[in-house]
A protein has these predicted regions:
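Blade/loop signatures of beta-propeller domains
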Residues: 25-57
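Short, conserved, GDST-rich strand-edge loop motifs in beta-rich repeat architectures
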Residues: 28-40, 83-85, 231-288, 438-454
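Surface-exposed loop and turn segments in beta-propeller and other repeat-based domains
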Residues: 48, 60, 105-117, 156-169, ...
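Short loop/turn segments that connect beta-strands within beta-propeller blades
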Residues: 96-100, 149-152, 200-204, 296-300, ...
């Protein structure tokens, strides 16, 4: 049996919210619920994962290609597209007629993909207002591609290596993106060059780029579309040592760490009698683990107007233990008044006031009081209900969707999903959730010597 067949997209038609039960302060013994049960995939019942956890996803499931880390939903809620990356086939899946009988088209088709159609893809997707085409972030190909939503054919491409003002970035990695409501401007992150791109969709050209923080990962527009927000997940800024790469003299490369973690030498770099080793920067800099606000009232003259640190600082005492890593804000979503950022390493959501661009609260995502000192919820994708009363969080580490009451900033409960929910969207009527599960139902046994791929 081909394990790739079990990577799923879960379409939830019914949302049920259960309140968390409070527990007394007592000793707990925690263990994997599966005990000594073998790994098992059960599409209609309880699946046993290799890590000993159970899967009992709500809603209905539809198969797409492996690792659907990206998701976009059309304005009418009838078309969803997933970006499938990680292992072959690198592809997108176009799901039409979501409200009735979904039809799924993989582009390019087949188990091996097609390098001539889609050589690279990562997360970023946007559907044009007329539902005719989808923009696809082509990752390390340093471009954005467009595909016809009806035929699945590739129609055009945007070269992100050069912009209208003459800037050149020959090496880039295009990720998350968001499209303006009128479809005239596309905003995308270049993870490799630490920048945010502004693209004119009529000219199919990058018109401006803005330097942002370390490793930009998530992006969102404010409701009035006067600002775009970028979430930076990176801690350090790595630099090349001298001219080793240009001269291919790799014998001069270091085979050992140049400095200790979080030392002055690490932050600022060191100089020896033979080489200069650049520093990695301050892990608590506003360039690291942060959300940046960029004014786009004039797309020809974008300006960074705020740098917001989210979650816990490196070294900050949390539950009596100093934090080693940062917050890793990875995804963003905005309402009229608030911007929400999911802090993947802190298991919480930062609430940012859009008027002041400052944090007003962090919402903890602990499924139970007995495990409050542990980390591992891994909040990822975010979505808001049309009435802006509920926030939905893809909790990748516990295979669930967290439901938060926005007026009260309170967790209401958790909805079971497939393995490692990544991105999610709410249909326009507010009745359904569409969520991609990056690991689907997990993997079963190997196919054996007679297995045929496909």
């Amino acid at each position: 049996m081909n394990f790739r067949q079990f990577f799923k997209l879960i379409l939830l038609f019914c949302i049920t919210v259960s309140s968390c039960q409070s527990t007394k302060n007592e000793l707990y013994v925690l263990s994997a619920p599966a005990g000594n049960l073998y790994t098992k995939i059960n599409r209609t019942g309880t699946t046993v994962l290799p890590n000993g956890r159970f899967l009992t996803p709500a809603g209905k499931s539809y198969e797409v290609a492996p690792h659907p880390f990206g998701l976009v939903l059309s304005g009418d809620g009838e078309i969803a597209v997933t970006a499938n990356s990680g292992i072959s086939p690198l592809s997108i899946s176009i799901i039409r007629n979501l409200s009735s009988k979904p039809e799924i088209r993989q582009v390019p088709p087949g188990p091996s993909g097609n390098a001539g159609v889609l050589e690279s893809v990562f997360m970023g997707l946007a559907i044009s207002p007329d539902n005719k085409k989808v923009y696809v972030a082509a990752g390390q190909d340093n471009s954005i591609l467009t595909f016809d939503l009806l035929t699945g054919n590739k129609s055009d491409s945007i070269d992100c290596a050069v912009s209208a003002d003459g800037e050149r970035f020959p090496d880039g990695y295009i990720g998350d993106m968001v499209l303006s409501k009128d479809g005239t401007h596309l905003f995308a992150v270049d993870q490799m060059n630490f920048r945010m791109l502004i693209i004119d969709t009529k000219k199919m050209q990058v018109i401006k780029s803005v330097q942002v923080g370390r490793y930009p990962f998530g992006i969102a527009l404010s409701h009035d579309e006067k600002k775009v927000y970028v979430a930076n997940v990176g801690m350090f800024q790595y630099s090349k040592i001298g001219r080793i790469e240009q001269t291919s003299d790799y014998k001069k490369a270091l085979s050992f760490p140049a400095f200790g973690y979080n030392t002055e030498a690490m932050r600022n770099g060191i100089v020896t009698d033979s080489m200069v080793i650049p520093g990695l920067g301050d892990p608590n800099s506003d360039k690291a683990f942060s959300v940046w606000a960029i004014s786009i009232e004039d797309c020809d003259n974008p300006k960074v107007i705020a740098r917001i640190k989210t979650g816990n600082l490196v070294g900050q005492m949390v539950d009596g233990i100093p934090a080693v890593g940062g917050s890793s804000p990875n995804s963003l979503v905005a309402t009229t008044d608030w911007l929400f950022a999911s802090n993947g390493s802190n298991d919480n959501i930062s609430v940012i006031d859009l008027k002041t661009d400052s944090i007003v609260k962090d919402i903890s995502l602990k499924p139970d009081e007995s495990v409050k000192h542990f980390r591992g919820v891994i909040p990822f994708g975010l979505a808001v209900s049309p009435d802006e009363k509920k926030l939905f969080v893809a909790e990748a580490g516990i295979n669930a969707i967290g439901v938060i009451d926005i007026p009260a900033f309170k967790v209401l409960g958790h909805i079971p999903t497939g393995w490692f929910p990544s991105k999610l969207k709410i249909t326009p009527d507010g009745r359904n959730i569409v969520v991609t599960n990056a690991k689907g139902y997990g993997s079963g046994p190997n196919g054996g010597k007679d297995f045929k791929e496909g």
